[in-house]
């Protein structure tokens, strides 16, 4: 029930955003594979959501245009609508949108400093170790925050933004370095940093459909 409610809320957010920008109907006949068109042909809401999923792609180059606060909040709300194990909600977000904060972060990453400076918005998705399951379920936060991150990526695309998931955890050197740069308390572990902004140029999604990677039923 919790998962169903979360998805219902996210779907409503995506549909509103898609409708507002006239995206839901644009190129729907050409971008959706035939099997998906057939599955959603009688449901406009489902069609809008599937269109958003199938056309999302990673974007790394952005216009020098700030992301509006109302959209930042929408992204965070979409993230917090994700399902989590035992409803632990082990998330904490660090948002960098001010130029001085972004430049400070860039100074700590000499290999990508110039690209970082050109990025309008960072959302670091972190795990709160005080809200984790015990025993064998301790690492479930990785799954939880992966669902959070995908919600943010899809919501960004729905609102006309581009985004890309940049890995931090489990590379310990990155975890330690970014934790120091962001001055994170000991109870927070950064899973990733999502870079977000208005795309500088159109990006085409990859066709990743591969029937060889599917098994139906239990093999003998």
Question: What are the language-model segments listed below?
Answer:
Residues 2-17, 26-220:
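Acidic, surface-exposed loops and disordered segments
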